[in-house]
């Protein structure tokens, strides 16, 4: 029943995509939905196990810290591998990022493409294109940065969070969206990682990070609002 609703929505919005001289159509696959449900389930299971490690006696606290770090690493790597190793057609915008990477052969090519894309993103793509020759590597690096910032924040506030809720919530609400909305998810994860600066009233440093992130995605500028309040 639920899959039928998803399928109808998917088919209604399944427009053609042109890239590389070819027209492509996305195809529905129940197996993909089962895979996504598996990711949600395994992230909940690992987060629950990590929460369980929290309730230990003082005598075994050192050992528990090691187990907690290992648990964080396991969850991190599972989510990173699925996100970073996805195909170019997983996520509508992934192919657009791939195309931007392929075309970023010089700064002039990057900045003369008649797009309104943020300058920091263009420079970052040019740097990646200079170092690497595969768009899949670029997508993996974007994914690795997103996951790093999110999990560094979760780990910092570990003692104040219920991971069995926090991690599955991240997966269901933001993780799958990041397969498509790469730039804004990277900007959001970086600013999430910067939240301690706001909490500790280090407004100048926080403002600098907002300003920098704004040149990755212009919507980041709204984060100046909490400073005004």
Named regions from a protein language model:
Residues 1, 9-14, 21-79:
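Start-transfer (signal-anchor) and selected internal transmembrane alpha helices
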Residues 63, 69, 74, 85-108:
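Extracytoplasmic loop-helix module adjacent to an early transmembrane segment
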Residues 95-103, 110-133:
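Short hydrophobic/aromatic helix or loop-helix immediately within or flanking a transmembrane segment
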Residues 125-128, 138-149:
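Transmembrane alpha-helices of multi-pass, membrane-embedded glycan-processing enzymes
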Residues 151-172:
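Transmembrane-helix signature of polytopic, membrane-embedded enzymes
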Residues 174, 205-228:
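Membrane-interface alpha helices of multi-pass inner-membrane proteins
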Residues 178-185:
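Short acidic/glycine- and proline-prone juxtamembrane loop motifs at membrane-interface regions
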Residues 191-205:
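Membrane-interface transmembrane helices that cradle and orient dolichyl/undecaprenyl
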